[in-house]
Amino acid sequence: MEYILGAYSQLPFGSSREEYETLLSRQLKPLLTMVYRNSSLKLLFRLGISEFEYLEQNHPEVNMLINDLCRKGQLEILSSSYYDVVLSLIPTHERTAQIEKTTTYIRKNFSRKPRGLWFYNQVFNPTTVPAVSLSGLDYIVVSTYNQVSGMTEATRPFYTEEMGKQALVFPLDDRYSKETADLYNSSTTLEKYLSNIRKMASENTSSISTIMLNLDQLMGTEGSSDVFKVIFDVMGNRCTLPGIYLSENEIARTHYLPGGIYGRDFRIGKLTSINQLIYENPKFSRNYGLVNMLRETVRDSKRLIEDRKNMDQILMKASSSSLYFPDECGNPAIHRSVNRYSCEMEVLLSRISNMVIPEETDIDFDRIPESLIAGKSNITYLSHRGAVLSRYIIPSALTDLAFHSGDGLFADSFINDKTSKEMKLAAKPYEVTSL
């Protein structure tokens, strides 16, 4: 039986130096060194752009090793969105541009053009299928295990279709993902984990198995990188890569893969979509609405923006979806990173002549617009609910003082004498007039 073995990391944009170094020392170096020393081994690989950039700046020798393995045909790198954006959260015309930008970065730095696509945190939406072929890619790699239903959609490669466009999907073998998640959640020991992996790897199946292991979940346990050696030792030299497999096999099976958050990268509870996760959290929805407003402002003000390339780069960083996921949303470093680039966008746009940012905009989807007041020393979004400051930006520090509060600044509350219940001023809309 042939198998595809892969490794992926999704350390969010804005992660700390310590996290990058732990990933490198405990996972990347042992894994890449093992593949380099055995020319018969092949590995499917995914890192985020921010991770590649960190390696380029701090450990260029690692990127050189990755480049060498790509040229030898031992490593196939997956493309993805730029700076960890969930593709379904951005406009349709920007999805292809995001993928192509990542693909170009990988091609220029690692000598090979990616052929496959990875979805950040395995958030899949059928509407992104057309972007695969438009980006010149051949296949998608994603789990089809749905945490809500507890069911796995498919175990063999298949074609999925949307709007007349097809994309080939290599579904992950969820057994390995489950064992890795259990180790991460301390539901099993390293010894038992490696034993279970060895047992599964010894089983023969008639169809190809696609195994992708989450390095972020493994890096917390020292010695867990041995799992790759276990799989290679048991399953031998039958490992292949999707590109090679497609050149030797014809896929005829079709299956419609519905939208959802797949795999076991994080616990989603009863959530059925990324949109639900965002709209149920005031801070997330405000950030999402803000980024959408900034994107539309940039689009409508092309002729007024002198350095459009720099503006687009900042907007991509501000659009990072890493903030929205439970495992990362409590990380202050992620908050600061996402917040900084949003603030930088607002400062740059506010300094353009004729003030291109709309004076009223609904950034939190409550159907009541906020009023924007921009000055030299601060930029303020004044909510009509209780005159709360939804955002209070200090341009010199590129920070929003209200960002860490779900209610905004000055969301005062008091005890109602008649009902003895707490009431918030933010619950009542107020009319805002100019002085």
Predicted features along the sequence, with ranges:
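Active-site and substrate-binding clefts of carbohydrate-active enzymes
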Residues: 1-30, 36-38, 156-158, 162-167, ...
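Short, well-structured secondary-structure segments
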Residues: 2-91, 115-119, 138-144, 241
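Generic structural signal for well-ordered alpha-helices
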Residues: 28-32, 63-67, 96-106, 129, ...
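Short, charged, surface-exposed secondary-structure boundary motifs
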Residues: 88-90, 148-156, 179-180, 249-252
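CE4/NodB-like, metal-dependent polysaccharide N-deacetylase domain
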Residues: 94-121, 195-212
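Gly/Pro-rich turn-and-neighbor structural signature
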Residues: 108, 113, 122-159
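Short His-Asn-centered micro-motif
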Residues: 118-122, 142-143, 170-172, 213-214
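Beta-strand-rich N-terminal accessory domains
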Residues: 355-434
